[in-house]
């Protein structure tokens, strides 16, 4: 065993302090790094071996702390945290930026006709379903019925919103019409995420004290967690869907895009991608992954149980999800 690296680094937790926005942002910039999708199977397996060996107390000679953390984040980017299975490539967090920039750019380029709206909103919700399935809980996996209901409902909601707003904006400024895809995505998130996590709203999510001791399950905590996720997902989409319309509205009046109109989609995809590189990790970092709420905000029955065992406890903690 090498003396260069201590055996007690907690690689189950993020490298940076998650109680601060900066710490959370650094963590998510690493988690969503698109370069991770280019890693080979050999590189992924090598990272998994480093992580598994370190957890068993086996430290390869010459391994540095930076190399250990790099292996940990490569491992986390490709393998499911509960099952340890390798995740579908497009469902990984590192695929979020390239996949979303392509889909969002196309949604915002081809939004004027009904077939285009139907196709791109369907593609977007299909991608969301893959992401939700890939990142499902290993302890309480989604059933096919739950996944199907959320998928169909979100797709229907997104298409209905987009088509309805397209009809309303036919006689207004073209710039306003460019914001229709964003409204559709926001509506879909408000439908998709609660439906995808409906079991949590029924039976609750685990709540703990600050030391991780489980206190029970709370549906009120689930409501707060899901609300935070919906807000962060909508804000995550906002820069990539709110900034490009202004830029494209100006560019399409210029000689270049008038001469080469086919360049409109690639230019828009590039602008969206630039926005998402920053918006995705920064909006994931808005709320702590380990969220908290006051004991007085819990269900009366759970409050009573907690007061019997931990009369001095004021706050409980829970995993909000992504």
Curated annotation (Swiss-Prot):
Organism placement in taxonomy: Eukaryota, Metazoa, Chordata, Craniata, Vertebrata
Mitochondrial matrix side: 2-102, 168-174, 250-266
PANTHER family: SIDEROFLEXIN, SIDEROFLEXIN-1
Membrane topology recorded in Swiss-Prot or TrEMBL: Multi-pass membrane protein
Gene Ontology BP terms: L-alanine transport; L-serine transport; one-carbon metabolic process; serine import into mitochondrion
Keywords associated with the record: Acetylation, Amino-acid transport, Membrane, Mitochondrion, Mitochondrion inner membrane, One-carbon metabolism, Transmembrane, Transmembrane helix, Transport
Protein family: Belongs to the sideroflexin family.
One Gene Ontology MF term: monoatomic ion transmembrane transporter activity
KW Transport (keyword) present: yes
Protein name per Swiss-Prot or TrEMBL: Sideroflexin-1
